[in-house]
């Protein structure tokens, strides 16, 4: 075995074959970092047949003017069941970064620690407890089992829907009542989904602005999304949910015709048997449905007059690799939330994953606080409703490479606080 630099193709070919390969460890992210001017390294291990058997993207930024801080975001991509390989990689990684005047190194492996449900109850251990002792023996210090959202540390909890051996109908059956109703509702409401082009990204950004204001969270800058759309290429999809009013109004009119037939039948039943309580109840129920239907028709006609035939209502930002579809961000028009556009977006992308043989649909980060007072309690409830599971990852590890200077660096940081 040898630790070596990799070409972009070697790196990409390997990471695309591996499970637990995060989108930050793919060629598109390497191209993005290079374009941003970030010092970037592709490194890995090759066996005696010159085959890549481990890989990671490393970035380096200046620290204290003369040193560098190295970071592997969700790396390395490696078979963690091969403990000998893991030991060799992390040992050689320290030697590699030392050659580049590294002050300290941070890694946060995309490695599950344990599995939970959305009540926070542990449902299983991932079998990777040994990694803590292994990395400690190599000089890496674990940063703790943090919860919540941190500007430096990667989120430790993901909400993940397993799609292995499931059809779209299986997924629908396993949803809770609200998710099931809203997923069916968007079909009736004439909500369609298409993918946005780069020129149309401002539509997505406007929805994110709406959502961040309503839910009071800090969104990323426009450049974050635009740059990833550009460099990740076909690994990014931005589905837009919209209403086609011609089709929607036609569906509502068809529904009205059916309701009118049923209503006339109920009237005839009452004529024949005025004492028929069931027919009277049916008549009242149909009158309510007809009234609701007419309100929808009126609303649709007014909105069509205001916006034209198509009205965008929701959009999401998804990052895809062969291992998983990641729901990174999403936003909805506050004014048209009642059309449930976000459910159309999710349903479209769940079907995309199934159709492309991708077994993992990642709703992405949650805080790890499962109480009703959690800052993301509503988000947790939404993701739970799709019958997703929670994966807790092992967390961050730091290794000082130049220990004396790292201690000085930490002291200076404390003094600045």
Swiss-Prot record:
Organism lineage reads as: Bacteria, Bacillati, Bacillota, Bacilli, Bacillales
Presence of keyword Disulfide bond: no
User: A biological process (GO) annotation for this entry?
Assistant: cell wall organization
**E.C. number, please?**
2.3.2.17
> To which species is this protein native?
Staphylococcus epidermidis (strain ATCC 35984 / DSM 28319 / BCRC 17069 / CCUG 31568 / BM 3577 / RP62A)
The similarity annotation says: Belongs to the FemABX family.
PANTHER family tied to this protein: AMINOACYLTRANSFERASE FEMA (PTHR36174:SF2), LIPID II:GLYCINE GLYCYLTRANSFERASE (PTHR36174)
Protein name in the entry: Aminoacyltransferase FemA
Q: Which reaction is the catalytic activity of this chain?
A: beta-D-GlcNAc-(1->4)-Mur2Ac(oyl-L-Ala-D-isoglutaminyl-L-Lys-(N(6)-Gly)-D-Ala-D-Ala)-di-trans,octa-cis-undecaprenyl diphosphate + 2 glycyl-tRNA(Gly) = MurNAc-L-Ala-D-isoglutaminyl-L-Lys-(N(6)-tri-Gly)-D-Ala-D-Ala-diphospho-di-trans,octa-cis-undecaprenyl-GlcNAc + 2 tRNA(Gly) + 2 H(+)
Q: Which GO terms describe its cellular component?
A: cytoplasm
Described by its record, this protein's role is as follows:
Catalyzes the incorporation of amino acid(s) into the interchain peptide bridge of peptidoglycan, using aminoacyl-tRNA as amino acid donor.
Could you tell me which SUPFAM superfamilies the record lists for this protein?
Answer: Acyl-CoA N-acyltransferases (Nat), tRNA-binding arm
Reply yes or no: does the keyword Acyltransferase apply. Answer: yes
User: Which InterPro entries has this protein been placed in?
Assistant: Acyl_CoA_acyltransferase (IPR016181), FEMABX (IPR003447), PG_Glycine_Bridge_Synth (IPR050644), tRNA-bd_arm (IPR010978)
From the record, what ranges are coiled-coil?
A: none
Q: Where in the cell is it found?
A: Cytoplasm
Q: Which UniProt keywords apply?
A: Acyltransferase, Cell shape, Cell wall biogenesis/degradation, Cytoplasm, Peptidoglycan synthesis, Transferase
Q: Which GO terms describe its molecular function?
A: aminoacyltransferase activity; nucleotide binding
Q: What class of enzyme is it?
A: transferase
Superkingdom of the organism of origin: Bacteria
**Pfam families per the UniProt record, alphabetical:** FemAB
């Amino acid at each position: 075995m040898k630790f070596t630099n990799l070409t972009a193709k070697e790196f990409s070919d390997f990471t695309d074959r591996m499970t637990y390969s995060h989108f930050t460890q793919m060629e598109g992210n390497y191209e993005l970092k290079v374009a941003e001017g970030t010092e970037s390294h592709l490194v890995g291990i090759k066996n005696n047949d010159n085959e890549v058997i481990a890989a990671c993207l490393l970035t380096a930024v200046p620290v204290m003017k003369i040193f560098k801080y190295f970071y592997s975001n969700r790396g390395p991509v490696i078979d963690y069941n091969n403990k000998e390989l893991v030991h060799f990689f992390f040992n050689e990684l320290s030697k590699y970064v030392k050659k580049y005047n590294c002050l300290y190194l941070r890694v946060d492996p995309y490695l599950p620690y344990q599995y939970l449900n959305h009540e926070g109850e542990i449902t299983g251990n991932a079998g990777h407890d040994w990694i803590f002792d292994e990395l400690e023996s190599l000089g890496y210090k674990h940063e703790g089992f943090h919860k919540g959202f941190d500007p430096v540390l990667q989120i430790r909890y993901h909400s993940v829907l397993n799609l292995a051996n499931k059809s779209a109908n299986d997924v629908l059956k396993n949803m809770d009542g609200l998710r099931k109703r809203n997923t069916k509702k968007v079909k009736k409401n004439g909500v369609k989904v298409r993918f946005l082009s780069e020129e149309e990204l401002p539509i997505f950004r406007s929805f994110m602005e709406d959502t961040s204001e309503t839910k009071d969270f800090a969104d990323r800058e426009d450049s974050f999304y635009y740059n990833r759309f550009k460099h990740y290429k076909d690994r990014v999809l931005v589905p837009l949910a919209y209403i086609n009013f011609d089709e929607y109004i036609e569906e509502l009119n068809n529904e009205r015709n059916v309701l009118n037939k049923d209503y006339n039948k109920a009237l005839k039943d009452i004529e024949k048997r005025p004492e028929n309580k069931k027919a009277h109840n049916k008549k009242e129920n149909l009158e309510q449905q007809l009234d609701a239907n007419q309100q929808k028709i009126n609303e649709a006609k007014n909105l069509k007059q205001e916006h034209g035939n198509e009205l965008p209502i929701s959009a999401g930002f998804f990052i895809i690799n062969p291992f998983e579809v990641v729901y990174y961000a999403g936003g909805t028009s506050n004014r048209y939330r009642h059309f449930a556009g976000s459910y159309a977006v999710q349903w479209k992308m769940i079907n995309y994953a199934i159709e492309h043989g991708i077994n993992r649909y990642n709703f992405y980060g949650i805080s790890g606080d499962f109480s009703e007072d959690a800052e993301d309690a509503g988000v947790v409830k939404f993701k739970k409703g799709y019958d997703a599971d929670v994966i807790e990852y092992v967390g961050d590890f730091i290794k000082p490479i130049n220990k004396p200077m790292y201690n000085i660096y930490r002291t200076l940081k404390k003094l600045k606080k």
